[in-house]
UniProtKB/Swiss-Prot annotation:
Modified residues (Phosphoserine): 37
Annotated protein name in UniProt: Trans-2,3-enoyl-CoA reductase-like
Mode of membrane association: Multi-pass membrane protein
GO molecular function, a single term: oxidoreductase activity, acting on the CH-CH group of donors
One GO cellular component term noted in the UniProt record for this chain: membrane
Amino acid sequence: MFKRHKSLASERKRALLSQRATRFILKDDMRNFHFLSKLVLSAGPLRPTPAVKHSKTTHFEIEIFDAQTRKQICILDKVTQSSTIHDVKQKFHKACPKWYPSRVGLQLECGGPFLKDYITIQSIAASSIVTLYATDLGQQVSWTTVFLAEYTGPLLIYLLFYLRIPCIYDGKESARRLRHPVVHLACFCHCIHYIRYLLETLFVHKVSAGHTPLKNLIMSCAFYWGFTSWIAYYINHPLYTPPSFGNRQITVSAINFLICEAGNHFINVMLSHPNHTGNNACFPSPNYNPFTWMFFLVSCPNYTYEIGSWISFTVMTQTLPVGIFTLLMSIQMSLWAQKKHKIYLRKFNSYIHRKSAMIPFIL
């Protein structure tokens, strides 16, 4: 009996010990689970492991042929899809140093239009091999040089005629006849016009970094310089006759000339800067400046003001050479305005569908 009681007591003791051990284990498990839960919650949601992307850059092989002889000049390999025609010209020059980038014109086919420098290879490529034809455009000059030469010449030429140097006019006749005030006013207006052109070329206009053939510079200078010589010769001639309606005609036309010059300047400044949205692709919209309100009526007000200036100068001086020059400039600017107007219609039809190109309600 004593042994049985002793064995029962030992079994009870073992059971109590096992229960206590189980409780401690459960408590530890609960603590571990609670700690693990906090750790998971603090770590946030599970995120999938980002897949490693391997960028594949497409390369093109460009074959360049001579547009005249149709013979292959070179092959440019490993040209990326983001490369432009300008980049291709640079690589072409490295491969063939005699082909200067400013003198090279690249075409997709012989006789086709020359590709602009900003065009990307991806936009013209039909396969991994691109065929281009190279043409030597001859001696090239920058557009800035063209504009500066065009406008500096008339400014200096007119001043030479205004000074009435003896090799142009008869010295005795020049000394005997006094100049009419409109002669001085015409010189002032003419100088203001071309000084504005020069300053805008240097500080306002965003002139293209491209080049143009030398013959275009010669043709432009011949046109502007030749007409300036003809105009200045008549206005500054000792036998020049003033306008028919006297000071009233001169004053009104001079005021209108200055207004058009100011309007032209403000329009050019506005066109050279993006609008308030910072987007160059938006159609120019008028602002608080009254000179910009012409945008309500026409899509190219800079040409409108330019023609207005020359019409005013024609009325003020009342000379045939100025009238002919104004007529030719009006025809040329109307063509430019219609071309730009068509571009605006394609891009911003909702903005300018009721506007004219250059002359309100007419053209």
